[in-house]
């Protein structure tokens, strides 16, 4: 699980805690201090062809990422950014938090619809199709999910 997902459902900044421990501080909480609340989903918004997962280099002409309650977007992207064809194709990590899985899926659909990226191909259409897919909605997913649902690739 990505640290960002864990942070949204526990309320603890894991990176900050890791840095503090690395500096010699004692961990300021115990396992029993950690409670889980709600459900979180993260979509990696990569500059890639959503059918073949090959990089899509180019200039971002426009980009807008949603914000608000239950939404977190970690990004370095901005209009004019030159997405290289090598290295990591990640443009943003889009996360949502909801009271339960159904609420989180609903919020992610809205967040994906409110995200705008032009100038490069990206994975938003794939993520949107996944959010509508029955097995995903039912939580029936494995590491072979995409292999088992090739129709999602477009």
Language-model segments: residues:
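ATP-dependent carboxylate activation and anion-phosphoryl transfer catalytic cores
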Residues: 1-154
């Amino acid at each position: 699980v990505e640290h960002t997902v864990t942070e949204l459902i526990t309320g603890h900044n894991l990176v900050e805690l890791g840095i503090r421990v690395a500096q010699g501080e004692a961990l300021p909480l115990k396992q029993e201090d950690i409670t889980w609340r709600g459900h979180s989903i993260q979509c990696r918004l990569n500059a890639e062809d959503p059918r073949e997962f090959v990089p899509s280099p180019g200039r971002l002409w426009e980009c807008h990422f949603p914000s608000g309650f239950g939404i977190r977007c970690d990004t370095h992207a901005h209009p004019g950014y030159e997405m290289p064809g090598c290295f990591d194709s990640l443009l943003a990590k889009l996360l949502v938090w909801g009271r339960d899985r159904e609420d989180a899926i609903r919020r992610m659909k809205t967040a994906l619809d409110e995200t705008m990226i032009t100038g490069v191909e990206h994975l938003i259409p794939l993520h949107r199709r996944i959010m509508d897919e029955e097995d995903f909605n039912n939580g029936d997913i494995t590491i072979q999910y995409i292999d088992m649902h090739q129709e999602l690739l477009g």
